[in-house]
Amino acid sequence: MTAQTGQTQSQDARIIISVDAMGGDEGPAAVIAGCDVSARKNPDVFFILHGPEAEITALVNRRKSLQGRCEVRDATGVVTMDDKPSQVVRNSKGTSMWSAIEAVRDGSASVAVSCGNTGALMALSMIRLRKLPGVNRPAIAVLYPSSNQQGFNVLLDVGADIKADADDLLRYALMGMSYARNGLDLPRPRVGLLNVGTEEHKGRTELKEAFDLIKEQQEPAGFDFVGFVEGGDISGDLCDVIVTDGFTGNVAIKTGEGTANLVGNRLREAFRYTPLSRLASLLAYPSLRRLKKKIDPRRVNGGVFLGLNGTVVKSHGAADATGVSSAIKLAAQLAHIQFTDKLAARVAGLPAEEKTQ
């Protein structure tokens, strides 16, 4: 089904987002609800939705703001969270995830968004979109709440690949710097390399080698390298970009999520403990609400796959309408600034001796 847009905007003004409607834990209803939130806030955003046509069309027809803003592409197969990436690669044609990536590959859409299986999404994205020249391992970058002026730091890799050698870490630094410059409007981002200490003699061999490589590139690439940083700096203001391997990065963000949940639960318990504490919670409510808004993970939901010939945003699998809308907002911003082209130019600008042989 292809709905007529009925809009007065020119074709060039549109940002078309390809959405895997079947990937999330909450099902297509939450994904379509997220599209609805985005459509009401962003009149220049249009959607190609992938999933069983009858089911998706019925959900779209219930949302007034989506009328004339969506094309539904029939895809009856679904990639589940339990599917192994190797199995998905062999049997993915006809799935909503495959179809969503294909829309970026064939130029129908600028960015793909999926709440689905991370490993499968990365595998399909690498196969269908291919890696940028000079990139050995793509990375997943997320915005992590911080005390910096912009409110977030860029953290990568957070799970694309558990291994990373010195050359990979250099490329992560350049890709993360490009993301911070274009996505957070930081003209000269500060980059830190995550380690067990800040002293130059600490850490594994590949970290020490990466230290030298990144340091050499800071002036040619236009960023400031602050050296080694520790786990406490991920949410601090020492740097804007934190570079690490996918194993460490994934543990870091999930530890952060768990800690945030623990603190939230303990606060609720404390405020419910006595009548006086319940009264105090009412007095503190405006401040607590502002705090929640600042650190709400749904506001920055979306990991960006960096290093591919196309932009893919991975939303949290359990995202609700607010979370999906945040991922779509991020996707639209990246499409608007033509981020993939800028990233490709940045990676291609490395001196020949620094590129992967």
Swiss-Prot record:
One of its GO terms (cellular component) is cytoplasm. Keywords: Cytoplasm, Lipid biosynthesis, Lipid metabolism, Phospholipid biosynthesis, Phospholipid metabolism, Transferase. GO terms for molecular function: phosphate:acyl-[acyl carrier protein] acyltransferase activity. InterPro entries: FA_synthesis, Phospholipid_synth_PlsX-like. Its EC number is 2.3.1.274. GO terms for biological process: fatty acid biosynthetic process; phospholipid biosynthetic process. It catalyses: a fatty acyl-[ACP] + phosphate = an acyl phosphate + holo-[ACP]. It is found in: Cytoplasm. The keyword Transmembrane helix does not apply. It comes from the Bacteria. Pathway: Lipid metabolism; phospholipid metabolism. Its main location: cytoplasm. Transmembrane segments: none annotated. It is an enzyme of class 2 (transferase). Pfam families: FA_synthesis. Catalyzes the reversible formation of acyl-phosphate (acyl-PO(4)) from acyl-[acyl-carrier-protein] (acyl-ACP). This enzyme utilizes acyl-ACP as fatty acyl donor, but not acyl-CoA. HAMAP family: PlsX. Belongs to the PlsX family. Homodimer. Probably interacts with PlsY. This is Phosphate acyltransferase.
